[in-house]
Regions:
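Active-site acidic/histidine proton-transfer and metal-coordination neighborhood
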Residues: 1-64, 68, 173
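Alpha/beta catalytic barrel-like cores
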Residues: 10, 25, 30-32, 43-49, ...
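Histidine/acidic residue-rich metal-binding segments in metalloenzymes
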Residues: 52-62, 88, 120, 125-127
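Glycine-enriched alpha-helix->loop->beta-strand junction motifs that scaffold or abut catalytic
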Residues: 64-66, 90-96
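Short, glycine/acidic-enriched loop or turn micro-motifs at the edges of active sites
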Residues: 74-75
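Acidic catalytic motifs of isoprenoid enzymes
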Residues: 82-83
Length: 230
């Protein structure tokens, strides 16, 4: 609702009944992964969102055999971070799903970058027990003001870099330092990790995949000039 509702529970009961009806249809849970996703607010629904965080998470918890909790890091209050929520959910759910995006003040779906929260999300996926195998990752962004192929490549590669960066860090060592209360050394090692040469590792990864590390934009520019602009 755009403004203050008179009945907050009724729409949620109807929403629950609707999802129940959808999930009552037979499907192969190995091939189809239904998800429930929350949102704090949106344009036109500033006062009340039926699928709140509490509603969606509660529904997923009560229906683990039929659906997964899905978190979009643009769907929460600006002071909340999805990276902190990942280990919380993986403690209770066998699998979770993510929409990785880049919010600016609200769920603006800007192109994913290799920024702090993107890196933190990747770290938690890697550091949680079997997190990579238990997390379904989708990228959720669009910016019509820039070349959409460039946007697609930039966002996709940014999260690949974030995962690669997380995989290169000494996670087991850091966990041991924390568990043995060596907090000063943990801080020092975590700071050292920030200046590790991830660029060199990324270039080698791209070389092994048979693609260019950073020289791809010229091809996109040529395609824009010769095809998209016609």
């Amino acid at each position: 609702f755009k403004d203050i509702p008179a009945d907050r529970m009724g729409p949620r009961v109807r929403y629950k009944e609707s999802i129940d009806a959808i999930l009552s249809e037979p499907f192969d849970t190995k091939l189809v992964k239904p998800c429930v996703e929350s949102k704090v607010f949106g344009i036109g629904v500033e006062a009340y969102t039926v699928g709140s965080a509490e509603f969606s998470l509660s529904y997923a918890a009560m229906n683990k055999d039929k659906c997964l909790p899905l978190m979009d890091n643009g769907h929460y209050h600006p002071t909340e971070v999805v990276s902190d929520k990942i280990p919380a959910l993986l403690t209770f759910f066998p699998e979770i799903a993510l929409h990785v995006t880049r919010p600016i003040r609200w769920d603006s779906d800007h192109v994913v970058l290799f920024d702090d929260e993107t890196k933190e999300i990747a770290k938690e996926i890697v550091r949680c027990e079997n997190g990579i195998d238990r997390t379904y990752i989708a990228l959720d962004y669009f910016d019509a003001s820039i070349n959409r192929i460039s946007a697609w490549v930039t966002g996709f590669r940014s999260f690949q870099k974030a995962l690669l960066d997380a995989l290169c860090q000494p996670s087991e060592m850091l966990k041991e330092l924390q568990d043995t209360n060596q907090m000063s050394k943990k801080m020092v090692v975590m700071e050292q990790c920030k200046t590790l040469p991830i660029g060199d590792v990324w270039e080698e990864y791209c070389r092994q995949c048979g693609v260019e590390a950073e020289g791809w934009f010229d091809e996109i520019q040529k395609y824009e000039d010769e095809v998209l602009s016609k």
